Amino acid sequence: MDGTLHHEDGRYSLRFERRLAHPPEKVWIALTDPGELAHWFPTDVEADLKPGGAMRFTFRKNEAPPFDGEVLEYDPPRVYAFRWGPDVLRFQLRPDGDGTVLTLTDTLEEQGKAARDGAGWQVCLESLYARLDGTADPAPDRWQQVHPGYVAEFGPAASTLGPPT
């Protein structure tokens, strides 16, 4: 399990942090370029990349209806934050020698989806890491294998919502 659950200011958030052997500029492109996002992010993304810019998320397999978001922070190549439905995703990049420390924080609308979303983001991020490294994607459909670990770690209150449809 890569994600941790935090409770601050009355809200729950998931946090993932990993050092990557790539410069911030390369990681930034993977986080913001629609062609790169298609390799690891769960939806297609249309975005006006500036604070206040409109976003549109469309699931590739029609798992759910498209939905809108908004760019909240855009500071290349350091911070990219946006509304993801009722949640807020914040990607932060910090140079670290010849690499980058990537931190993803997902501020959740409700605690009950923490295990579901934690498993989902872990699988997505593993696909991102593989894309950056030029290696094979480690089974992008392995959510079912990862989810039970998050349920066990986060507990029943963080596990009330099941798998994405």
Residues of each region from the PLM?
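Beta-strand/loop substructures that line and gate deep hydrophobic ligand-binding cavities in soluble
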Residues: 72, 79-132
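A conserved amphipathic terminal alpha-helix motif
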Residues: 108-165
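Glycine-rich portal/gate segments that line the openings of hydrophobic small-molecule binding cavities
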Residues: 38-86, 161-165
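Hydrophobic ligand-binding cavity/cleft-lining segments
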Residues: 1-44, 165
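Short, ordered beta-strand-loop transition motifs
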Residues: 5-11, 49-51, 73-75, 94-97
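Residues at helix-coil transition
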Residues: 32-33, 42, 76, 126, ...
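Intrinsic-disorder/low-complexity, polar/charged segments enriched in Ser/Thr/Lys/Arg/Asp/Glu/Gln
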Residues: 11-17, 54, 66, 79, ...
